[in-house]
């Protein structure tokens, strides 16, 4: 892979999370003039992927498989108690963590673990293989 190419890491499970409509469907803010949908939707990722596949740089992109992170990898950034809380929350249909705008629902764990693992794959490629790497994932996995 040449330096002018971009390694894009992708895993389809990142699309499994439904973020809802954001915090506005939970508690509307009197400070906001209009409610808006949550910006981190599967459709946004689908559109970014489409732009990369159809756009001017499409011939300079190498698509590489992402992966699911392990629980141990997630535990490098979050406590075991928090991981357990998210796992338990997913079992209870759609819920919000700590009363916030963070929605957890069926599909969230697959999406979170896929996005985290895909991001780690891109990071490893950048650090170990000196690739220009990008993880096509969602920000709810920061």
PLM regions and their residue ranges:
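HDAC/HDAC-like amidohydrolase catalytic core signature
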Residues: 1-140
